């Protein structure tokens, strides 16, 4: 149930971002960023943790409000990396939003450069106690969408590369949070290279998606999937139009025996292309056709 509510909140946040990005003469505001955060987190909640000595502690995560506690991360190299202090967060976010609006108006930075630098500066502030990554991704796509670029996704398989690009930029910028929050473009070159490549891949995939219509070509998690056995594509299309279809019905529509249908289903489930709908019965298709 919690996962379903989080998914609904994410969808609402995505729609908010897209609608706001479509209003070209509306500047970015701190209030919009906080509203996105409140939408994603939905409500305040308490986090309980055990300290090294076994002592219990707790604190409240506030939806839509900047952090009231220091936050940091342990890097993959074992170092503790500090983000901006709570008392400087509001001022740094004001600087960030003002800078963005001014730079967008000037038009000297490309949309990719603008989005990459905003993302890096935002991450160095880490203004909320939770949900910073989700907000960072939404605002990056807000910036790209305002300039008619495709949305990007940092997929789980690419997270290590993403974190390494940030780390290399951190080495050039330095560890002081306030300096990171005002970093210049030439100081974040490792992250800019990574980000530019990510956008280029999304554009390339979008072009392929639009120009390569084929019944057997589908897309999953940003990757092209070509089925060499046509029955895979056929069964997926049946599931899309008939989510509650039964195995017996699939057997009849495909003209194959029941064990063959079960092998197809098992393969599709194993790869994550479909999943059973627990409460409603039937199937949910998670892969996208190119035609």
Regions found by a protein language model. Give the residues of each.
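FIC/Doc superfamily catalytic core
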Residues: 1-130, 134-291
């Amino acid at each position: 149930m919690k996962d379903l509510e989080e998914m609904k909140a994410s969808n609402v946040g995505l729609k908010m971002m897209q609608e706001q990005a479509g209003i070209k003469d509306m500047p970015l505001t701190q209030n919009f960023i906080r509203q996105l955060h409140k939408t994603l987190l939905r409500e305040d909640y308490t986090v309980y943790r055990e300290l090294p000595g076994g002592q219990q502690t707790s604190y409240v995560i506030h939806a839509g409000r900047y952090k009231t506690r220091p936050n940091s991360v342990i890097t993959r190299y074992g170092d503790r990396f500090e983000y901006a202090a709570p008392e400087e967060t509001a001022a740094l976010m004001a600087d960030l939003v003002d800078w963005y609006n001014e730079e967008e108006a000037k038009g000297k930075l490309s949309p990719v450069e603008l989005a990459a630098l905003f993302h890096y500066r935002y991450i160095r502030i880490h203004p909320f106690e939770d949900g910073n990554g989700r907000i960072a991704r939404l605002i990056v796509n807000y910036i790209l969408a305002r300039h008619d670029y495709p949305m990007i996704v940092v997929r789980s398989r690419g997270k290590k590369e993403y974190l390494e690009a940030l780390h290399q930029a951190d080495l050039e910028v330095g560890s002081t949070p306030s300096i990171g929050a005002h970093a210049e473009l030439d100081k974040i070159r490792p992250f800019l290279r990574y980000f530019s490549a990510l956008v280029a891949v999304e554009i390339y995939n979008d072009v392929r998606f639009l120009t390569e219509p084929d019944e057997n070509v589908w897309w999953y998690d940003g990757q092209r999937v070509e089925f060499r056995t046509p029955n895979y594509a056929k069964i997926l299309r049946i599931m899309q139009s008939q989510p509650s279809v039964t195995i017996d019905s699939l057997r009849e529509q495909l003209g194959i025996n029941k064990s063959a249908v079960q092998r197809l289903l098992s393969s599709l489930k194993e790869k994550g292309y479909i999943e059973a709908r627990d409460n409603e019965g039937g199937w949910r298709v998670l892969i996208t056709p190119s035609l």
